[in-house]
Amino acid sequence: MLTYPAIDPVAVSFGPLKVHWYGLMYVIGIAATWILARRRVQRSANPLFTPAQVEDLVFYAAIGVVVGGRLGYALFYNFSGFLHDPAMLFRIWEGGMAFHGGLIGVLIAMYAYGRSQGIRFFDVADFLAPYVPIGLLAGRIGNFINGELWGKPSDLPWAMIFPHAGDVPRHPSQLYEAFLEGLVLLIILQWFSRRSPPRMAVSGLFLLGYGVFRFAVEFVRLPDVQLGYLAFGWLTMGQILCLPMILFGIVLLAAAYARRSA
């Protein structure tokens, strides 16, 4: 069993103002995405975007992540809590961001930005998709520091006892997701996007990869207490939301390569 590193959720304080690690991780993820995406267009011989457009796109996407993620959490995972306390939407430092809601927010943001610039939607999506895992990696580390979204009881050597989760060692499911949805998916998408794939293929691979990884980790992650398992004694809301992602990812990949061969 490993010892959980009880890190103070507050990274730094300025008098009454407290900067939480959870929010700081989102800032780090967004900043890293901006830096790497900007460097890509600067090094490209035929960039689809200018550096200034990258800055605008990342800004649009960041707004979509925060607004969509918070609304998605309220609607998908804690609707009764939202009805009881609507102000919870603004307390981001407490945790509670739903990836699937954030994804919807980013899709809307990309559509709006592409339309304003006269750029096709999947050109925007294929450009941004390889950088999304950076934010996922940072966000899951933020979950780990917060000591939330832990996994089921486990006797594996790397199991941990989390605060507020009793005295039972558990899967550090946040780190599983950080590794799979963050690091592994980042490497796969960066490699794949540099092999001149057809339009829609990068977006499709992102949806498929994230959906499969998240669906798998949900088997060892405890569901949100207010929802529990929704069917069969194991199916979670996260898995239900991943199923259309997996299906749509396969459809996009098949359509992308069918169009290329045609």
UniProtKB/Swiss-Prot annotation:
Gene Ontology terms for molecular function: phosphatidylglycerol-prolipoprotein diacylglyceryl transferase activity
Catalytic EC class: transferase
Listed transmembrane segments: 17-37, 57-77, 92-112, 200-220, 234-254
Protein's UniProt keywords contain Iron-sulfur: no
GO cellular component assignments: plasma membrane
Gene Ontology process terms (BP): lipoprotein biosynthetic process
Membrane topology: Multi-pass membrane protein
Pathway it works in: Protein modification; lipoprotein biosynthesis (diacylglyceryl transfer)
Keyword terms: Cell inner membrane, Cell membrane, Membrane, Transferase, Transmembrane, Transmembrane helix
Keyword Transmembrane appears in the UniProt entry: yes
Job description of the protein: Catalyzes the transfer of the diacylglyceryl group from phosphatidylglycerol to the sulfhydryl group of the N-terminal cysteine of a prolipoprotein, the first step in the formation of mature lipoproteins.
NCBIfam families named in the record: lgt
HAMAP family: Lgt
Family: Belongs to the Lgt family.
Name assigned to this protein: Phosphatidylglycerol--prolipoprotein diacylglyceryl transferase
Origin species: Methylococcus capsulatus (strain ATCC 33009 / NCIMB 11132 / Bath)
